[in-house]
A protein has these predicted regions:
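Fe(II)/2-oxoglutarate oxygenase catalytic core
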Residues: 1-163, 169-171
């Protein structure tokens, strides 16, 4: 008996637990984001509202507001999220619940240990997380984004301008 899939299989996309766009943002767009973020102050990143220990997370963050200055970034991200969601997960997406988090990992041991991008309160509504690689991987050592499902993990593609989209409930 020759079985056919109920849904057509798209051979030309990455059928994984995450979706990515190599060169999702151009070098010029990345430079615009980096330069535009300079007016906002960094603060030490915390883990939820409990503070932070450098053991779990060592980074600095700033929040880029939803305003006309960043509208083009949000529009581009949402277009990519829509494509990824329709291709892989088909989540019922209603709104954006967070401003854009701009994160800088310090050269001296900067990291963020295994974690979920969901938790109590407003972040319990998160469904999809997005990362945009703002630096050229040749400029630093380490810094791999890894996604774990079950007991296996995958190191996702990285390159300046690469956008990686994944369900917030994955490690």
């Amino acid at each position: 008996m020759d079985l056919k899939p109920i849904f057509p299989i798209k051979e030309d996309i990455n059928q994984t637990n995450y979706y990515w766009f190599e060169n999702g943002f151009t070098t010029q767009e990345i430079d615009t984001i980096v330069n535009g973020s300079l007016e906002y102050e960094f603060q030490k990143a915390i883990i939820m509202d409990e503070g932070n220990t450098d053991k779990f997370r060592k980074s600095n963050i700033k929040w880029l507001p939803f305003d006309s200055k960043w509208e083009w970034v949000i529009d581009k991200i949402m277009s990519q999220v829509t494509e990824a969601n329709k291709t892989i997960w088909n989540f019922d997406l209603k709104s954006i619940i967070d401003n854009i988090q701009y994160t800088e990992y310090e050269g001296n041991g900067g990291h963020y240990d295994w974690h979920l991008d969901i938790g109590p309160g407003s972040i319990s509504h998160r469904k999809i997380s997005i990362t945009i690689q703002l630096s050229d991987p040749e400029e630093y050592v380490g810094g791999d984004l890894q996604i774990m499902t079950g007991s296996e993990y995958t190191t996702v593609p990285r390159g300046k301008g690469t956008v990686v989209i994944f369900p917030s409930f994955l490690l």
